[in-house]
Every structure is written in structure tokens, then in C-alpha cells.
Design a protein with these regions (language model features):
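Extended, well-ordered alpha-helical scaffold/bundle regions in very large, multi-domain proteins
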Residues: 232-261
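N- or domain-start disorder-to-order transition segments that initiate the globular core
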Residues: 1-6
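Short glycine/serine/threonine-biased micro-segments
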Residues: 14, 24-26, 249
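Active-site-proximal helix-loop-helix substrate-binding element of RNase H-like nuclease domains
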Residues: 18, 22-105, 136-224, 234-236, ...
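Short loop/turn and capping residues at structural boundaries
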Residues: 12-13, 79, 181, 258
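A short, flexible low-complexity segment enriched in Lys/Arg and Gly/Pro that occurs
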Residues: 227-231
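Intrinsic disorder/low-complexity segments
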Residues: 94-138
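Short acidic, Gly/Ser-rich segments with clustered Asp/Glu that frequently serve as metal-coordination loops
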Residues: 7-8, 12-20
Length: 261
């Protein structure tokens, strides 16, 4: 259904902000305003009485990779770099059979200029990034980040949380969401939140992200569609997201001799 919809908002829920060591507790998808689904991920446990029917992480990753690799499907995230690092760091957990299947899901080569925009399409929706073939399959073939879009539309927004989903949901959408601090008490993590509360919070994040994208994209088309420089800036920001993510995951090589020379 998400593939058929053509665009879907995605959000990860983890037990910490460390994208390498954190546990992927679940994820949310939303492709229709006001309707979202939260998918809890099964956690490894030695307790036979603590097993659940939740989807296993490797199977969840495989299905998400299939969604992300679908040609023409826009995946929308808020602060995408976090979600991308969480998912990319788990690609190695796929079985050989799943890895072989993923190899057959082609994302395709990027169009000229690495952009999906054309002379007739200068909206934010037309400037998503087509990932190059070398990009890991857990990177969407077409990606938009509402946090970056909000920043480009208003780079002078004040406050350290001025681009948070919570703040933008209130100021742009007029929607008040569930407070994270109301769910997770001091000394706890999201893993301690009961499922009936976790799914409401997670699904709400994905729903807000989709609605925010539509609202910001409409504003972008109104204010920036006749400004080629703005279009190029958005295109560039979307292009570098996967690159920066890979750099932060794997590091970069520095020629210390050249730097000290």
C-alpha cells in the first residue's frame, strides 16, 4: 500500500540516540493524513516466556529496503540522518537469502544532475535525491527531509528546538502531539513504554511528518518555484544526506601528511 501510494512518511523508535548501538524498537509508516501504522520489532531475549509475535528485525529491514528501493516512491523523514544511520547500521543482519533478494531490487542510476526535477517541475516534491547505485539499499531512492525543508524556508527560526517535529507540528500544522517526556520517565527509555502508548506516539510522528511535508511543499512551491538558486540549494541538501550519513557511519580518510605539510 505504501508503494502504491507513491509517498510515505517514515519514523524510527529506538532505545537511545546512539544510532550504532541502539535497539530498533519499532517504526511507523504513514501514507495518508490521519492514518498511520506502528510496527513493533521483536527484541532478542533468552526468556522463552518473553517472546512476542512482533516482526524480527532482519525481516523488518528487508521489507523496508524493498520499500525504499521502489522506483518513484518518495520516503519522507524528519531529521532523516538519524533514521538513515539506524537502518544502515543494521544492514549486516540480513540473511544471505535476503541480501541476495535485495541485490535484485534496483534503485536505478540517477538522472542527469542527480535530480528528479525537470523544467516543468520546480516544486520541493520534484527535487528529491535519486541515490546512486553505490548507495546502500537502506537509503531511499527518493528522499525528502522535512527538517531541512523547514530550515530552507525559514533559516532564522530561533531556539535549539525550532526545527523539531514537535515545534513545527504546533506552529505549522496547529497540532499538539504527545510529549516524549510524558511517556518516558527519568531513568527510562522508549523500551519501557507499554505498546498501547508506544504505537500512538510512533504513529503520530509519522502522521505529523507527512502532513508537515505537504504543508511545507505547498509553501515551497508558492515562494520558491521561480527561484532557480533556491531549487538548486534544496537539491544539493537532499543529495548530500546519504553521503554525510555514510561518512558518519564509516568515517573518512584524512591524509595527515598533506594536512601537516
Amino acid at each position: 500500500q505504501a508503494i502504491a501510494a507513491g509517498q510515505v512518511a517514515y519514523d524510527s523508535e529506538t532505545d537511545s540516540l546512539d544510532t550504532i548501538s541502539c535497539k530498533l524498537l519499532g517504526f511507523s509508516l504513514c501514507y495518508e493524513d490521519g492514518k498511520a501504522v506502528y510496527v513493533p520489532v521483536q527484541q532478542q531475549s533468552d526468556d522463552l516466556f518473553n517472546q512476542t509475535d512482533n516482526i524480527e528485525e532482519k525481516d523488518a529491514i528487508a521489507e523496508l529496503a524493498r520499500l525504499f528501493a521502489a522506483p518513484g516512491v518518495r520516503v519522507i523523514m524528519h531529521n532523516a540522518k538519524f533514521d538513515l544511520k539506524v537502518l544502515a547500521s543494521r544492514a549486516g543482519k540480513l540473511t544471505p537469502e535476503q541480501q541476495k533478494a535485495l541485490a535484485n531490487w534496483k534503485t536505478g542510476e540517477p538522472a542527469a544532475g542527480n535530480s528528479t526535477s525537470t523544467s516543468a517541475d520546480h516544486s520541493a516534491a520534484g527535487t528529491g535525491h535519486q541515490s546512486p547505485a553505490a548507495t546502500p539499499l537502506l537509503f531511499p531512492s527518493l528522499l525528502s527531509d522535512t527538517m531541512i525543508l523547514a530550515w530552507l524556508l525559514n533559516p532564522e527560526r530561533l531556539g535549539k528546538n525550532g526545527y523539531s517535529l514537535e515545534f513545527l507540528g504546533e506552529t505549522v500544522l496547529g497540532l499538539k502531539g504527545i510529549e516524549f517526556s510524558d511517556l518516558v520517565k527519568k531513568g527510562q527509555t522508549f523500551a519501557d513504554v507499554p505498546l498501547e502508548s508506544a504505537y500512538r506516539y510512533g504513529a503520530e510522528d509519522a502522521d505529523f511528518t507527512l502532513q508537515l511535508y505537504k504543508k511545507l511543499d505547498e509553501k515551497w512551491q508558492t515562494e520558491c518555484k521561480n527561484h532557480p538558486a533556491a531549487e538548486k540549494l534544496l537539491e544539493l541538501e537532499m543529495k548530500v544526506l546519504p553521503i554525510l550519513t555514510r561518512m558518519e557511519l564509516t568515517g573518512i580518510h584524512l591524509d595527515s601528511g598533506a594536512l601537516n605539510g
